[in-house]
């Protein structure tokens, strides 16, 4: 079946101060390749075979190579020890595995916006997205499995949980102390996170996003709820519930499993545009195209 283990009898270890212990280095490598939504080809399928799951992950790797050599992917280098997940899709609610319908207001925004967006090339670094610039993928995107850098480290102290994602070296420090409701004044890139324990599950509610780390068109009204539950000695179920009435007609839930990999996985220093020529090449190529078009126009 999947990498996850039975949740019914498993009791996670406790920290010295009596909270469920989620600490360690986890990876989402097994979840790489799981589509967000259930495809038509698996409409009546509850689970893939191991062979189908392996082929799906390989397709996902090959389809996302673009500027990266195949040899440098985690699956090629041998970092990936866990078998590919046989989970059909991440969306588990609605039960059909499909995202809810978008709102009429959001459809109107998309319809009015799309025809007016001209082909653009970056003029300055800020014209490129925060993911391209290796700044942030946002609170939803940062947790998602990718073709590499799927490590996740959790560190706990009394009243706090730190979650560090290998991709873009993002770290969130989440208080689990009782707090009053969310204020409305300050909106940030990663929002305001409030944590609490529900039995053995860490529940994190995120509000007050500024809308600039949008996920699938989400707005600053989005409310994100994240649930982390150890389901076995080496597995942790992660659920994310998105409630954005400005975009979707109802909330929806996704889920996948992290696998504990303390023995051989290490989060080393992450460097992106700081140590290569990606941004320089992107901007200089755009300026070269501008110059070529200007020269062609002058010669007409």
Regions found by a protein language model. Name each.
Residues 1-300:
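PEST-like low-complexity, intrinsically disordered acidic/proline/serine-rich tracts
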